[in-house]
Amino acid sequence: MTKVFSALRGSCLPILLLICISGFSSPEKLIQIHYQEVDLAVKKTFIYEDLTLQLFENETLIKSSKIRLNDDMKIRSSLSSLNPVLLHQLSIPSKKYRYDGAAMARLKLVYMTNSFTSPIFDADNPPSELRYLIPKIKTLIQVN
């Protein structure tokens, strides 16, 4: 009996290690990108989910458009270098929105089991890690 258990343990150990390592390294699936800008008069919310980008102004749906797969890949690749767990620690280049009436913004990434939110930042001057993503989302809603 001990020999059988030893043989099974020896043959199953590499498989268990492979399962554990591959499960640990694979990222969770991104479900939704939620970007919001608020200024003195208007609150704009951009929601990107399932190749659909929606624009809301003051909680009213203004526009909804389908995004091409190529653009989806660009958006997701721009997020690949960003660790979502550390999103709340992004360095804010400017805090002008606090005193000059500039629009303030916030990004929220929603995954299968967790969501991660950035600190509030100046909408015209996002953290360097988001400098591709934010303009891309705003441009896609205008183009489509």
Model-derived regions, located:
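Mature extracytoplasmic domains of secretory-pathway proteins
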Residues: 62-96
